[in-house]
Amino acid sequence: MIKNGFKFSETKTVSMHFWKGRANYSPNVYLGRTRVNDVTETRFLGLIFDRRLTFKSHIEDLRTRCLKTLNVLRVVSHTDWGADSKVLLRLYQALVRSKLDYGSIVYGSACKSNLKKLDTVHNSGLRIALGAFRTSPIPSLHTEAGETSLELRRLKLTLNYVLKLKSDPTNPAYDSVFNPKCVDYFNLPTTKATPPLSIRVLPHLEAAKLAMERIELSERPVTSPWLLDTPEVLLNLTHHKIIMTSRGCIQRNSALPHQ
């Protein structure tokens, strides 16, 4: 990595030991001669990871950020000069639902009690966009807005990811999903550990009757895009005014260099 110009920052690098047990064992990790700080949770690519992979801190942070964004919808949905429901739903999808979707494949392994905290954000956003009362039934909100519950949406995004991953065996995550390890351990009735994505998604694939072996592999181009010849663009007609140039002249001049 040093040859490629990449260097780890000693002050920004942290270590975290993922462990489900009660004992808190943290190995000493050194970067050169500097000991890396050991933390209980850290943010990586917008997701907050904790030692036990409960994603409780991430869900709390995500809920707080989404509730602040809902204030924008409340302002825009003014009864006198506010936007209509169609525009408000688009704003909700762009500002709030996009945040809920990001990383849902990862934090979807959290327990249901933590994930339900996000359902209130989703339902509140739909109520604001539709102008519905607080007593409106949740299934009616989903039907009127054309939205599904967050649980079904997370499942949809997960299945889309798995199907796309199946078409690319060169992906680094391919073996982890389709060649899982310790399957028998997670299938034990006494196991309390959360199964990985590869095991959680199997019942849904079987219920949907998706034939994974029939998914075609994605074809990669033989030549890299940056190695292709740059196409020649003819801009001769830009020197003539449209008013002074007839349609027939334009057609003849544009086809002449290609004959």
Q: Can you annotate each of these PLM segments?
A:
Residues 3-40:
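Short, conserved micro-motifs composed of acidic
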Residues 33-105:
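Basic, alpha-helical interaction scaffolds
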Residues 20-33, 53, 78, 85-87, ...:
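RNase H-like, metal-dependent ribonuclease domains
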Residues 2-9, 76-83, 105-108, 133-134:
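Surface-exposed helix-capping loop/turn segments at secondary-structure junctions
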